[in-house]
UniProtKB/Swiss-Prot annotation:
Its cofactor is [4Fe-4S] cluster. Residues 1-23 are annotated as: Disordered. Residues 236-466 form the Radical SAM core domain. The gene is miaB. This is tRNA-2-methylthio-N(6)-dimethylallyladenosine synthase. SUPFAM superfamilies: Radical SAM enzymes. Binds 2 [4Fe-4S] clusters. One cluster is coordinated with 3 cysteines and an exchangeable S-adenosyl-L-methionine. Coiled coil: none annotated. [4Fe-4S] cluster 1 binds at residues 104, 140, 174. InterPro entries: Elp3/MiaA/NifB-like_rSAM, Methylthiotransferase, Methylthiotransferase_CS, Methylthiotransferase_N, Methylthiotransferase_N_sf, MiaB_methiolase, rSAM, rSAM_horseshoe. GO terms for cellular component: cytosol. Catalyzes the methylthiolation of N6-(dimethylallyl)adenosine (i(6)A), leading to the formation of 2-methylthio-N6-(dimethylallyl)adenosine (ms(2)i(6)A) at position 37 in tRNAs that read codons beginning with uridine.
Amino acid sequence: MNEEQRLGRNGNTDAVSTKEAGSATKDYSKYFDFSNAKVVSEEDGKKVIKIAGREISIFDQPDYKQGKRRGKEEVKVLRPDDLIPEDMKTIGAGKKFLVRTYGCQMNIHDSENMAGMLKEMGFEATDETTDADVILINTCAIRENAENKVFGEIGNLKQLKREKPELVIGVCGCMSQEEGVVNRIMQKHQHIDMIFGTHNIHRLPHLLRNALFGKEMIIEVWSKEGDIVENMPRAREGKTQAWVNIMYGCDKFCTYCIVPYTRGKERSRRPEDIIQEVRDLARQGYKEITLLGQNVNAYGKDLADLDYGLGDLMDEIRKIDIPRVRFTTSHPRDFDDHLIEVLAKGGNLVEHIHLPVQHGNSEILKLMARKYTREQYVELAQKIKRAIPNASFTTDLIVGFPNETDEQFEDTLSLVREIEFDSAFTYIYSPREGTPAAKMKDNVPMEVKRERLARLNALVNDISAQKNLEYQDKVVEVLVEGESKKDPNILAGRTRTNRLVNFKGPKSVIGDIVYVKVTEAKTWSLNGEMVEMAEVNG
């Protein structure tokens, strides 16, 4: 999943901290020393240890070696009707919860599931930490900066825990799948009550019960992915846009990426379950869905009984009465001709392709284990543009990969000029503990990396501004998402090509699709005037 979805949909990142962007500065080795821990008991698959006065019940801990293994075990589809134990169905009556989400849309999707379970247990949502009885921090491990923010929040909650000792604080998500992170929390953040990972979200009611009725810190992090759990409660944010997960995990193992370790192997949902979910959302009046996966283009490859891929799925979904359908994130290796053919049919399949390239030099791409060359990417991009000539084409780019030369960086600049991306999300490489790239020696000074990022951003911004000028004085279809973050008197929404549009209009059109005439084209957004409502609102 790309950095655009992880960190927000607008803009690139000019400011990068030295700690975040430099060579690996994190040293978690000290957190692997448990000489000060006392083993209290070991039985029935549970180990209880005591550190600095607090007992910790360990059911499962993260293990990178286990997380990397890709076995041939059958992945079952579970449809439980008893996710919430009987004694937990009213445990939250009169209490409130807060789920803080960092990272990508997949994390937002997971947080919606957790919120759904908490609501079924009687809890009420709140945005205020001081009002919450349960706080869950759903974490992102893709960059060091994201981890630093999480540990900052964990530290800030320590005083609140002192004031409200009955408060339950849980840490979940991708960071929980990292060995060093869990060890650090055990030793340095003992006000945390439970830690669980990405594979056992459905176990939240049981883990919460242990945390509420026991005094120990609860740790249950499955290193190996589990089965696919359907029918999970979900509390979606809003009634306009919805995330629909179509698959889990990633098997690409790019050398810089932690996701295959934290999200497990690729597992596809059954197409009938996905289609039914989309139909339900259409009946509820949703205007846009985004099909989610770490690598959506690999969808269906693990379904042994079906010859069915992403193109087949989208060909069925395009017939459902929902105005807009998006998908993210793609990998160039799996973007096949059938998918291009289906996308070219248009209709509710929007004209926006986000296809992360990461670098413009074939040697660097090989070091990244992307398994394609620059030439192959260009050929694919041109094929897509020929089939969908009005499509917006965006990407992700990394600068400062270990030992990147000036010539190799120039190849990235020339690729941006050749493809003319409508926008790109650009980053200085951030080493991830446990990945092959983190072990590579790097002789590129940080000031050089920063200068390269600035040059790349200047080029991307220039092309983006030119592309946006093409919208000047044109009328575009906009899905109104809400008030502008900068001005509550201005509404904001997106075109089918994913351009941000700001305009004045009545609050009553939030959630609807309207037509807007573009009056000003800026680098990263468009300004306009509302013309009329669109017929697709029904």
